[in-house]
Amino acid sequence: MGEKPEVLDAVLKETVDLENIPIEEVFENLRCTKEGLTATAAQERLSIFGYNKLEEKKESKFSKFLGFMWNPLSWVMEAAAIMAIALANGGGKPPDWQDFVGIITLLIINSTISFIEENNAGNAAAALMARLAPKAKVLRDGKWKEEDAAVLVPGDIISIKLGDIIPADARLLEGDPLKIDQSALTGESLPVTKGPGDGVYSGSTCKQGEIEAVVIATGVHTFFGKAAHLVDSTNQVGHFQKVLTAIGNFCICSIAVGMIIEIIVMYPIQHRKYRPGIDNLLVLLIGGIPIAMPTVLSVTMAIGSHRLAQQGAITKRMTAIEEMAGMDVLCSDKTGTLTLNKLTVDKYLIEVFARGVDADTVVLMAARASRTENQDAIDAAIVGMLADPKEARAGIREIHFLPFNPTDKRTALTYLDGEGKMHRVSKGAPEQILHLAHNKSDIERRVHAVIDKFAERGLRSLAVAYQEVPEGRKESAGGPWQFIALLPLFDPPRHDSAETIRRALNLGVNVKMITGDQLAIGKETGRRLGMGTNMYPSSALLGQTKDESISALPVDELIEKADGFAGVFPEHKYEIVKRLQARKHICGMTGDGVNDAPALKKADIGIAVDDATDAARSASDIVLTEPGLSVIISAVLTSRAIFQRMKNYTIYAVSITIRIVLGFMLLALIWQFDFPPFMVLIIAILNDGTIMTISKDRVKPSPLPDSWKLAEIFTTGVVLGGYLAMMTVIFFWAAYKTNFFPRVFGVSTLEKTATDDFRKLASAIYLQVSTISQALIFVTRSRSWSFMERPGLLLVVAFFIAQLVATLIAVYANWSFAAIEGIGWGWAGVIWLYNIVFYIPLDLXXFLIRYALSGKAWDLVIEQRIAFTRKKDFGKEQRELQWAHAQRTLHGLQVPDPKIFSETTNFNELNQLAEEAKRRAEIARLRELHTLKGHVESVVKLKGLDIETIQQAYTV
């Protein structure tokens, strides 16, 4: 039976509070039963409520295509096309249709390529995102089915079990209580218990239990969707668009200046005819505008986007690639990104209190007091320490298991051994277990001392106790409890995190840890990862009451130099990004929950990590499909390679604009040489076709964050373009005003004659301009000698094919409509030789420009000692000092000053040198943990043992 929209109107308009009314009224309002919906009813409700996902604005393909033809560069070309046919030719000649058709063809080709590449990249990203779409187990037509979570509707009955991400807002039905992790929504770090009748939110995670639920809200109507809706999808203009506009404006202004000079000289001074003057202006317009620039850059980014997707980073916003190349600060979540998000026990640090018990026995006892199925994180960590999880119940018979509850804060197992004797083991919060112990007063001080030592290292403590139950009944209180041991729990770093952070530092990316955990845990993770321990509680920096010890220093400076932040709330993430951006850093931010969305949106590069919620993915620029930090660093390298290609092209484009404008302007003004506009179109078409291949060029990624340096681009473009223009002017003078080439090479003369029509000279100038202009790309793509850096094969092949075509046109073409005449192979050879000879100084000019722009940069690099140093071997000297210090400390050659480790440093008196010394001493502990001897000494120091006595008895 079909649903009438008005029946569910109250639900759609949210005038009924489905979250708080009795569960029977929920079913009544939703017009559903515990047997679920039929497929037909679900489909009808889907048309009423919409899909269970966040809305995304989609642009029509046609308007997107037109967008590529609607920008300042295209406007200039469109104006040139109109000039070609609208302005009179004079003498009864028809309009220049060939120029008009050529310009329009060039525009359409560029727009089509841009559209196809960007559309393909978008489709690829959409397909990958679709693969990440969550699934849900739903009751339809009386059968349980696995469906995409997007098709859920209010009234559906769903099944929720351990590990599931709740697909929609729902009310729980009959069953055991669930443990729900709502941290992605509310920031609560601990799971909350939800029982029958309680509401659960879309985006939260089930950590324990299994139950059925009725869906009460989907899509934008969920708590999740409303929170995400608050994050404005602002279409702010990115760095890339600003740079593109700046380069385009520079080229347009250069052309405008050239045209104004031509108009002033040609008409009032030279008294040139109307139409030849217009043709000269068209040459500057057509040849000077880098019409292919948006296309080349779009194609380069689209191909780069495919490459990033293969590496596990889906690019939602293309221009994020350019911003990632310049990223110099990455704020990374600790849990799940830097660490495994999986608790483990360090067996070698277990502190045993009972006689005759070793660490393996302690682990076995703790495992017996753990669930073997439907485990929480601590149970999984303990049982995971066993060689085989079955050992937890091997040789015993379980009588009763006491699950964890907030009151007792412990678990316990009552069991019978092989001889039929009853025993009980318990694990839990140390205070609760200590309270059970019969000898509490004797061991209390030692227990607290060990807990404090663990806490200093950022380790959580778990206590284990044991008792015999002589009565043999599970209800019996049993004999005296014996306090067995304290186990240290820690979320270990990923195996590749330390190496990845080292690579990031070498690449000039400063990784800052963001964690909701306490400061000690953050510092211990920092030590193990080698990323520094200069960390602060975020509330001390950004809260209402600032820590007195750091109140004298600017918060922005502390945030900039910090290695991480502990106790972070979602609003702190946003503030951290905002302050880093205020200090001119390009900032990346990782996140996974709805509460991270504002910070992800604010960051220059928002990165949604693996398993992030839809809201985080929606707010982000890049979505990761693999866990860990290494995929981000790989994406940084790939982005820098992509950026290098784009930067190489923009320098080339500016150079060509200057060479065309200056070169042809001088020829027109000095010798009244009218170059055919159609031949400039041919140069543009061949050059643009070749230059497309730069998107797959072989490049070396920059070793440091790379950004658009407009001064460098414009200066290089003006110098190289000016040099090429003078090459053309000198060639024209030698060919037109002297007999140098006929005398030396025996070619026919192109000197001025009484009946000069410039046709052969136009062919010669065409070939000279075409070959050397396109060869310039090999100079702009190189950081050293261009012939020493091997370009991509595709670029080389495209260059030779294009220039073979250009040479054949110059040699054989007799095109009256284009006013050119073939010059033969002799002149073609002379022009190629001329260009090769004058090509070599281009590299020298590029070196001189870099040197001139560098100023005293190297002196600054050597003296700079902050975390954002531009040194290639970032931190090498500091790492060597850390290692030397660690070795001296390890072998007793030097006793470190305990003040170095003081947490209450007076920052007013702290100078830079002392701060560095403090950091070196703290990080040195990491080195101890990475050697066998160092690890032993670490344990010895932690436990306060006598190392000399041990060394006398054992060889370490």
UniProtKB/Swiss-Prot annotation:
The active site annotation covers 333 (4-aspartylphosphate intermediate)
Q: What EC designation does it have?
A: 7.1.2.1
Keywords for this protein: ATP-binding, Cell membrane, Hydrogen ion transport, Ion transport, Magnesium, Membrane, Metal-binding, Nucleotide-binding, Phosphoprotein, Translocase, Transmembrane, Transmembrane helix, Transport
The protein's location, in the record's own words, is: Cell membrane
Quickly give the catalysed reaction: ATP + H2O + H(+)(in) = ADP + phosphate + 2 H(+)(out)
Q: Which domain of life is it from?
A: Eukaryota
Q: Name one GO biological process term.
A: proton export across plasma membrane
Against InterPro entries, the record matches this protein to: ATPase_P-typ_cation-transptr_N, ATPase_P-typ_cyto_dom_N, ATPase_P-typ_P_site, ATPase_P-typ_TM_dom_sf, ATPase_P-typ_transduc_dom_A_sf, HAD-like_sf, HAD_sf, P-type_ATPase_IIIA
**Side of membrane Cytoplasmic, spans:** 1-65, 119-247, 301-647, 698-713, 781-792, 844-956
- Gene3D superfamilies xref list: 6.10.140.890, Calcium-transporting ATPase, cytoplasmic domain N, Calcium-transporting ATPase, cytoplasmic transduction domain A, Calcium-transporting ATPase, transmembrane domain, HAD superfamily/HAD-like
Q: Which residues lie on this side of the membrane: Extracellular?
A: 86-97, 269-278, 670-674, 735-759, 814-822
Q: In which tissues is it expressed?
A: Expressed in roots, stems, leaves from both vegetative and flowering plants, and flowers at early and late stages of development with highest expression levels found in flowers and root tissue.
Report the PROSITE patterns cross-referenced here. Answer: ATPASE_E1_E2 (PS00154)
Q: Which residues form a coiled coil?
A: none
GO cellular component entries: plasma membrane
Q: Name one Pfam family in it.
A: Cation_ATPase_N
Locate the transmembrane regions by residue number.
66-85, 98-118, 248-268, 279-300, 648-669, 675-697, 714-734, 760-780, 793-813, 823-843
This protein's membrane topology, according to the annotation, is: Multi-pass membrane protein
Give binding positions for Mg(2+): 592, 596
Q: What's a Gene Ontology MF term here?
A: ATP hydrolysis activity
Q: Which PANTHER family match?
A: CALCIUM-TRANSPORTING ATPASE
Similarity annotation:
Belongs to the cation transport ATPase (P-type) (TC 3.A.3) family. Type IIIA subfamily.
- Fetch the NCBIfam families from UniProt: ATPase-IIIA_H, ATPase_P-type
Q: What does this protein do?
A: The plasma membrane ATPase of plants and fungi is a hydrogen ion pump. The proton gradient it generates drives the active transport of nutrients by H(+)-symport. The resulting external acidification and/or internal alkinization may mediate growth responses.
Q: What protein name is recorded for this chain?
A: Plasma membrane ATPase 3
Q: Which organism's genome codes for this protein?
A: Nicotiana plumbaginifolia
